[in-house]
């Protein structure tokens, strides 16, 4: 039991004192007030390990001096309207203090991440940072899994739970009192952590609230780290190592060395992990090859663990057990599912013949057509039923600008959803955008869509084709079998670094 307890300590030795001399001697809201200077991000550290910033403490000192030299009496009303820093607001100072607290609190967490990469040269290869790079891994692993746990991340019922979470990483009592004071004031102003991550990012105190949310979720995820370590005897390297190809080769080389030295005969150590885990859009997704009974036991185990250790009232109906063969999962703008392809093989032995029915699992990535149509309807490209309509807001633009905007949306969608196994939904979305563009141009010129399309001809659709589609159509005929396989099969690209706006569910 003592050995298991050590896994749940969660880096308790990483307890740091924050930079309180800087807080007490200077005005902390000057550190984070950078809107009028055009600065981005944190300006606190000079060249601290783990921070990529070109600003130094000298800039902070100049900001403080500039603030002290301002004369608040002679400020006109027009100046105060331009700069909210000088607007009388009782919540302004607490907001600046909270943002400054988040800047300082991020220091030990950044040092913890950098310590895992100690002694390694950090090289960046953009082609391995693509969102699409995870799908080839899922194609190999996901089809072997049986059940998926879809867990909605529980929200803390009281602010003291957040303070207790930070207490594991910070031993400064005054820091905890300051945190509790800020949370108490935010609760009085109606600012809480209840809601999704997208709602938190829209808040004015997003840096402070996101820091609390991430630290709280990190503490709740300790049970997943514990289960992962118990199910696999060879621990994986840090997630940051997978940002570069060189670390992948180093890990592979280390794997071969360990295999030849220690585990030459005992091959069961190299079995697949007990479960696969990912956090996405305010929920946890766990996939495993276990039975339904095992997943049910894990479900109630998670509920009891979070209630006893973090005082979270997590109801069992917020955890869903999905069979990966039937119910698709929404992940990074795609619908993931595993389809069973039946096949019949006729076997004959001497004079007797019989049929053998086999089922082959196939991993599928589908385009969420209904959610994309809903996003297009909100953007006024179509109605809720998916019927294209004109875009009145773009009717004042030139014809080339209108065609360029619609064409860019089509190409971006084709680029992002090129890995879908079935392209029917993607073709429907592109059809909506093409016809919406034609209706917008016809509305501008006060003509009908048919007459306008007849006047433009086939050159009108050239702007809507993706460049890879043009190359394939030039090399191969559309009627050839190779061309049909290229169009229908998934194509993954390694230059996609963010989720498409229509698929992010934040609109």
From Swiss-Prot:
Entry's Gene Ontology cellular component terms: chloroplast
Keyword Transmembrane helix recorded: no
Pfam families found in the cross-reference section: Intron_maturas2, MatK_N
Alphabetical UniProt keywords: Chloroplast, mRNA processing, Plastid, RNA-binding, tRNA processing
GO biological process: mRNA processing; RNA splicing; tRNA processing
GO molecular function term, any single one: RNA binding
InterPro entries: Domain_X (IPR024937), Maturase_MatK (IPR002866), Maturase_MatK_N (IPR024942)
Record flagged with keyword Metal-binding: no
Primary localization: plastid
Role played: Usually encoded in the trnK tRNA gene intron. Probably assists in splicing its own and other chloroplast group II introns.
Sequence similarity: Belongs to the intron maturase 2 family. MatK subfamily.
Name of this protein: Maturase K
Gene name per UniProt: matK
